[in-house]
Swiss-Prot record:
Gene Ontology MF: a single term: metal ion binding
GO cellular component terms attached to this protein's record: aspartate carbamoyltransferase complex
Name this protein carries in UniProt: Aspartate carbamoyltransferase regulatory chain
Cofactor: how bound: Binds 1 zinc ion per subunit.
Record keywords, A-Z: Metal-binding, Pyrimidine biosynthesis, Zinc
InterPro entries named among the record's database cross-references: Asp_carbamoyltransf_reg_N, Asp_carbamoylTrfase_reg, Asp_carbamoyltrfase_reg_C, Asp_carbatrfase_reg_C_sf, Asp_carbatrfase_reg_N_sf
Family affiliation: Belongs to the PyrI family.
GO terms (BP aspect): 'de novo' pyrimidine nucleobase biosynthetic process; pyrimidine nucleotide biosynthetic process
Quaternary state and interactors: Contains catalytic and regulatory chains.
Required co-factors: Zn(2+)
A Pfam family matched in the record: PyrI
Annotated transmembrane regions: none
Protein species of origin: Pyrobaculum calidifontis (strain DSM 21063 / JCM 11548 / VA1)
Length: 151
């Protein structure tokens, strides 16, 4: 028997599904979405999931997120599936994976790193060195960071 949807389907946009239960707000924060952009967003938290037991879902109307934009959420939602919806149909589906390179979003945790020096026009850059669990290295000072350290 099909159960009723808690939130209706969207016409165009992105559905982030299979988020670990309770992490939907963190996902929005990591994506830098505050709600003040005027996008129509639906959050569903702690609903039943066959794969995860319980899960969260985020539906963003009118914005198609790219893998580059969403891969960063793998730090807080490694199980997430991204669904791109057009005319009510899922036209693309992919799983998040740690990004190969992160530029300009996070600060290096090494206070002596050149990227933390005042008035240095250096963009913090981190390269993925290991996938499981994800480990990044600062391109400037060589300090290793887990994704959760950066966020
Ligand atoms: N969805 C939506 N609006 C649409 C189409 C899909 O909000 N127009 C949502 C569904 O509610 C679901 C997710 O997008 O949360 C994925 O949809 P779909 O691929 O149809 O579902 P499943 O086959 O169950 O997905 P999966 O195999 O990834 O579990």
């Amino acid at each position: 028997m099909s159960k009723e949807l808690i939130v209706s389907k969207i016409e165009n946009g992105t559905v982030i599904d299979h988020i670990p239960a309770g992490r939907a707000l963190m996902v929005l924060r990591v994506l830098g979405i505050t709600g003040r952009e005027g996008l129509r967003i639906a959050l569903v938290m702690n609903v039943d999931s066959r794969k995860l037991g319980k899960k969260d879902i985020v539906k963003i109307e009118g914005r198609e997120l790219t893998p580059e934009e969403v891969n960063i959420i793998s730090a807080v939602a490694p199980t997430a599936t991204i669904n791109i919806v057009k005319n009510f149909e899922v036209i693309k589906k992919f799983k998040v994976s740690p990004p190969e390179v992160i530029r300009g979003r996070f600060k290096c945790r090494n206070p002596m790193c050149i990227t933390n020096a005042p008035r240095e026009p250096v963009v913090p850059t981190f390269y993925l060195v290991k996938r499981e669990p994800p480990l990044f290295v600062c391109a400037y000072c060589g300090r290793y960071h887990e994704l959760s350290d950066l966020i």
